[in-house]
Regions:
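Conserved catalytic core of nucleotide-sugar-dependent glycosyltransferases
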Residues: 1-61
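C-terminal catalytic/acceptor-binding lobe
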Residues: 34-112
Length: 112
């Protein structure tokens, strides 16, 4: 069945690509205790250790337990956020494009 979509109001979705996603800092602050982390100890060419920053694994591939489906980094992040009480929204009035090995372009709303 078709679901009516307004072109002036964000729409809640299950997941989306993070390449054009606006994510508030508080999302990362909330999730950082829920994900694996590691203290950077990479040695540079001069033999000294760089900044010992903590790196959090927000974006990883995973297997979704309920469906046994492989989740890309984008979908893994969206699932992680939803599992911690968050919601994902799209702006249906936006036209998006992504260029990598292939060009992807699209719009959520079909305009007659």
């Amino acid at each position: 069945p078709e679901i009516p979509v307004r072109n002036d109001k964000p729409l809640e979705v299950f997941a989306g690509g993070t390449g054009m996603m606006l994510i508030k800092r508080k999302v990362f602050d909330k999730l950082k205790k829920k994900v694996p982390s590691y203290e950077n100890d990479v040695v540079d060419q001069a033999g000294s250790i760089g900044i010992k920053e903590v790196i959090h694994e927000y974006f990883a591939t995973s297997i979704e337990p309920e469906t046994n489906r492989l989740l890309s980094e984008d979908y893994h992040f969206c699932r992680l956020w939803r599992m911690n009480g968050g919601k994902i929204y799209i702006a249906p009035w936006m036209d998006l494009g992504h260029m990598g090995s292939y060009l992807f372009e699209g719009t959520f709303l079909k305009v007659d």
